[in-house]
Amino acid sequence: PVQVEELIAKLDTYYKEWVEQKTDKKTGEFKRYKDGTIKQRTIRPSLKELKVIQTNIKNRILAPIELPNSVHGGVKKRSNISNAKPHQGNKYQFTTDLQEFYPNIDFQRVYNTFIGLKFSPHYAHWLTKLTTWKYELPQGTPTSTHIANLVFLETDIKLIDLCNKHGITYTRYVDDLTFSSQQDFRHILNDILSIVTLGGFKLSYRKSKY
């Protein structure tokens, strides 16, 4: 449609951008890396008509897609609380997060995801244009967490299979990964790393804790 083409031609006017310092929800203090550096993220919320279009894409296309029980971010009736619950009482725990999760999801990966949802190349291209900015997935839009979940789905399934084989509980809340068990599973950490790396993502070593 002509209106959508005009909007895409002026995408820069439909986004805001700022750098935010991460704070701990419980204490209100800045989150820091082990070396004392304050954690930051770039927020890029969409505005006006683009936000409305993205909300429609989310509600009509993305939200109805069923995701594994292990996925808790951006899923109705799931939260960071439901993400933590399955790990209660487990003796051994490994927590880590995905480095630059949103920026690592580029235009091509989003396009491939829409193709995987059986959209024609023409529509997949339009949907990708409407949900990415500066050739990557922006953090802070209605569609980004849902798209990120779908891009990471193949990796999720591999991690779920690995964990099921070894009696490990696995959950993911957006870019935070948690693994736990009653048994020591240190010997499985390399396999976890390999699966994440093969999926085209990186674990943040500064945020990994066993």
PLM regions with names:
Residues 3, 61, 122:
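TRNA-recognition modules of translation machinery and tRNA-sensing kinases, especially anticodon-binding
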Residues 16, 39-41, 90-94:
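A generic secondary-structure signal marking the coil-to-beta-strand transition
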Residues 1-15:
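Amphipathic alpha-helical blocks
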Residues 18-45:
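Glycine-/proline-rich flexible loop or hinge segments
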Residues 7-8, 69-74, 126-128:
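Short coil/turn segments at secondary-structure boundaries
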Residues 86-174, 178-210:
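Conserved polymerase palm-domain catalytic core
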Residues 37-69, 102, 136-162:
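Conserved pre-motif C helix in the palm subdomain of viral-like polymerases
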Residues 50-100:
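Active-site-proximal segment of RNA-dependent polymerases
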